[in-house]
UniProtKB/Swiss-Prot annotation:
GO terms for molecular function: 2 iron, 2 sulfur cluster binding; iron ion binding; vanillate monooxygenase activity. Pathway: Xenobiotic degradation; vanillyl-alcohol degradation. Belongs to the bacterial ring-hydroxylating dioxygenase alpha subunit family. This is Vanillate O-demethylase oxygenase subunit. The gene is vanA. This demethylase system consists of two proteins: an oxygenase and an oxygenase reductase. Keywords: 2Fe-2S, Aromatic hydrocarbons catabolism, Iron, Iron-sulfur, Lignin degradation, Metal-binding, Monooxygenase, NAD, Oxidoreductase. Its cofactor is [2Fe-2S] cluster; Fe cation. The keyword Transferase does not apply. It comes from Pseudomonas sp. (strain ATCC 19151). Residues 1-84 form the Rieske domain. Binds 1 [2Fe-2S] cluster.
Length: 329
């Protein structure tokens, strides 16, 4: 399920990705229980055959010309991910899919995974756009007190939001000491650390993170004296209170080292599992006390601004849909 829509996603003719509503027009059986034959989706109940556009192609011993279409969702495969547009198909624009340089460039390595989390997708965005929680939720891996002490900058660029935090002359926490060693660098010397969070609506966050030996330029330090990566956070709402969370890390140092990729992935998976527990418990509290007011502090600027962007875009999309319906009436 994506955005409260039950979907079946599969590869049709020519391995092209297709997404249909998970509903057979014959008797309402889930098409996801079917099979793929000759690039078409075959219902596992009575053998009705569906095309990628939602039209019924055939059915054993039955004429199908008058069968109603089911909904087809625009879908594209790029950068190793499937991108589905769950809204009005007439408003789908593939140009809105962000370009991911690290996904197409062999100079980068990527490792990641998928978690199902029982929380509102906006809670995950809040979490990612304010990394002060690392000090407490991830104390044994990436957290340290200097995160709390570093000032945070926040700026809006159109529909995108960027927050940044820089720390100088600190000791690296355990995860980043291991990353320094992975790049063949000393891990017991002072470092400069950075966190730059970039929110792209509706629900994607890319975070530039890293450490460099102190005094070598920090974020702009030469590659041979730093360990840096891009934390990938693609959040797909499932329902109002659950998400599919695609997480990972892309790095440009030693991309050929598959063992290092596996170690980083394992460490990152453990870190994100800590977020999972916190977010699910937070969601339970919010459902139990929906009327209780919540505080907005200085550290919440990233989450607050990202929600404003989402609200503005939702309002604009609804207005566009209303205009389209008006023209069709």
């Amino acid at each position: 399920m994506i955005c409260n829509e039950r979907m079946v996603i599969y590869r049709g003719a020519g391995q092209r990705v297709a997404a249909l509503e998970d509903f057979c027009p014959h008797r309402g059986a889930p098409l996801s229980l079917g099979s793929i034959q000759d690039g078409k989706l075959v219902c596992g109940y009575h053998g009705l055959v569906m095309d990628c556009d939602g039209r019924t192609a055939s059915m054993p011993a039955q004429r199908v010309q008058a069968f109603p279409c089911i909904r087809a969702f625009p879908a594209q495969e790029r950068h190793g991910f499937i991108w589905v547009w769950p809204g009005d198909a007439a408003l789908a624009d593939p140009a809105l899919i962000p370009h991911l340089e690290w996904a197409e460039n062999p100079a980068w390595a990527y490792g990641g995974g998928l978690y199902h989390i029982a929380c509102d997708y906006r809670l995950m965005i809040d979490n990612l756009m304010d990394l002060t929680h690392e000090t407490y939720v991830h104390a044994s891996s990436i957290g340290q007190k200097e995160i709390d002490e570093a000032p945070v900058s926040t700026r809006v660029e159109g529909d995108r939001l960027i927050t940044g935090r820089f720390m100088e002359g600190i000791l690296a926490p355990p995860f980043w000491r291991a990353a320094l060693r992975g790049n063949g660098l000393a891990d017991d010397v002072p470092v400069d650390r950075w966190q730059i969070c970039r929110f792209t609506p509706p629900s994607h966050v890319l975070i530039e993170v890293g450490v460099a030996h102190a005094g070598r330029g920090g974020y702009d330090a030469p590659a041979d004296c730093k360990a840096s990566s891009i934390v990938v956070d693609f959040i797909t709402p499932e329902t109002d209170t659950s998400i599919w969370y695609f997480w990972g890390m892309a790095r440009s140092f030693r991309p050929e080292d598959n063992e290092l990729t596996a170690r980083i992935r394992e460490g990152q998976g453990t870190i994100f599992a800590e977020d999972l527990e916190m977010l699910e418990q937070q969601q339970r509290n919010l459902l139990a006390w929906p009327e209780r007011p919540l505080l907005k502090l200085n550290i919440d600027a990233g989450g607050v601004q990202s929600r404003r962007i989402i609200e503005r875009l939702v309002s604009a999309e609804r207005a566009a849909e209303a205009q389209l319906i008006g023209r069709q009436a």
